[in-house]
Amino acid sequence: MKRFVVLQLAAFLVVAGGLSGMLFATDVYQDVQETIVKVLCLSCLKLEPTTEVDFTFTTANQESHPSFILENLTTGPIFLHYSEDVCHGCDIMYPVIKTLFSIEFGKQDSVYEVIPFEDAMISYFYINIDHTTAELRDTLYIYDKDHVQGLPMFTVITLGYDKGVVKPYYTSIYGTLNKDNDQERLAFLTTLLQESIDIYEQNREGYTSG
């Protein structure tokens, strides 16, 4: 009888331990899964969102523009380039952006540079979300205009006039821009930057970063 009770107790402990392990493993799995799917690699999933260049004053999550954005807008338009380590679309766009701005950097670098572009100065930020600060990473959710939650993503911020106030005016585009080759992608981005410069010049006199 005592042996039977001992065996029952041992069996209970094994089952209880197994259930605890399952619960712990499930929590860990959910945490990992949430981290992985938080930002998708668009090309990995064979997704290519339609790229529409429509500027807006409203941030994607209703948060205020970060102070470093407001400050850099005193110099010229801003180009935010979001990437991650494992992302085929990011790899496609990486050399396109380097050609666009005549700049060299590593894929895991953090880059901030004010770059001459035609008759303007562009504040360029390269943000690899796997190797950046929380402040820069969080801007992805501020400017994910179409709520795609995918990479690569490119945000151009200029100045617009809204109800008597000059303030940040931005658009975000995604993936490989629905273009077939690098030449088309480069032409598309060049035109977008030219448009952002024109809008900026129309409104810069009325802007204050404070």
Where on the chain are the PLM-derived regions?
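Stable alpha-helical elements in mature extracytoplasmic
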Residues: 65, 89, 93-96, 136-139, ...
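Loop/turn elements at helix/coil->beta-strand transitions in domains of secreted/extracellular proteins
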Residues: 74-79, 118-125, 149-152, 200
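Solvent-exposed loop/turn segments at secondary-structure junctions
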Residues: 84-89, 129-134, 160-163, 176-179
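N-terminal leader/targeting and pre-domain segments
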Residues: 4-15, 22-75, 184-210
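Non-catalytic, surface beta->alpha helical segment in thiol-disulfide oxidoreductase systems
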Residues: 144-210
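Thiol-based oxidoreductase modules, predominantly thioredoxin-like and allied folds used
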Residues: 55-63, 82, 106-136
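Short active-site neighborhood of thiol/selenol oxidoreductases, capturing the structured segment around
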Residues: 68-88
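Typically the conserved alpha-helix immediately C-terminal to a functionally engaged Cys/Sec
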Residues: 89-114
